[in-house]
């Protein structure tokens, strides 16, 4: 008859029991899977791979290098900006000079374009509280390379012994300049290469005035 239940069909109670059993099995599987993942992670943490170690060491060394570079850069910058300027040597000191005069070491120089006799040139320099050029030493050779023509300097020859004397009364030293006799004369012009040339004192020449700053 149609209303008689088929014994092979599962009852509702059996269906619920199967469903509960399936839920329990799924929960147990997920729990085992989670424990497995946790175990794998813990093992990886306990025994890291060589690649992981190498990468970690490389990163640490890179960070250390950057920090060291920043520290040394800061030290160098601080040293450069805070370094005291060296005090100038006395021999290189150059004080104030009059307008249109050239300052070199401890002296001021004026190169005149006027041509005068030796006495006229001397008077012109004295009117400016200076004297005709005097060579103190060959250490000034770089400066006197600028001299390209003949100029009167403060050097005259003493008739009695024919020695050369500067305006201030000091005797010419071989370490200052070398005298070259060109013609009869008791005055001298400066040429170049630390050489002085005898000249007639009445000859017209340009001249160089100088004054010490110290």
Swiss-Prot record:
Disulfide bonds join 94-103, 97-108, 125-209, 187-201. Detected in peripheral blood leukocytes, macrophages, monocytes and natural killer cells. Residues 98-210 form the C-type lectin domain. It comes from the Eukaryota. GO terms for cellular component: cell surface; external side of plasma membrane. Homodimer; disulfide-linked. Heterohexamer composed of two subunits of KLRK1 and four subunits of HCST/DAP10. Interacts (via transmembrane domain) with HCST/DAP10 (via transmembrane domain); the interaction is required for KLRK1 NK cell surface and induces NK cell-mediated cytotoxicity. Can form disulfide-bonded heterodimer with CD94. Interacts with CEACAM1; recruits PTPN6 that dephosphorylates VAV1. This is NKG2-D type II integral membrane protein.
């Amino acid at each position: 008859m149609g209303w008689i239940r088929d014994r092979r069909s599962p009852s509702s109670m059996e269906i619920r029991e199967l469903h509960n059993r399936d839920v329990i099995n799924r929960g147990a599987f997920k729990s085992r899977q989670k424990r497995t993942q946790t175990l794998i992670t813990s093992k990886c943490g306990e025994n890291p791979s060589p690649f992981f170690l190498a990468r970690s060491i490389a990163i640490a060394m890179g960070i250390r290098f950057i920090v060291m570079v920043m520290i040394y850069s800061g030290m160098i910058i601080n040293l450069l900006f805070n370094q005291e300027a060296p005090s100038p040597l006395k021999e290189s000191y150059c004080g104030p000079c009059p307008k249109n005069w050239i300052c070199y070491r401890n002296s001021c120089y004026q190169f005149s374009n006027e041509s005068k006799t030796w006495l006229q040139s001397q008077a012109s320099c004295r009117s400016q509280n200076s004297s005709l050029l005097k060579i103190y030493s060959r250490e000034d050779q770089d400066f006197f390379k600028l001299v390209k023509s003949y100029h009167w300097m403060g050097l005259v020859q003493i008739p009695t012994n024919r020695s050369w004397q500067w305006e201030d009364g000091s005797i010419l030293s071989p370490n200052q300049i070398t005298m070259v006799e060109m013609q009869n004369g008791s005055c001298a012009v400066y040429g170049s290469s630390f050489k002085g040339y005898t000249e007639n004192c009445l000859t017209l020449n340009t001249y160089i005035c100088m004054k010490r700053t110290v």
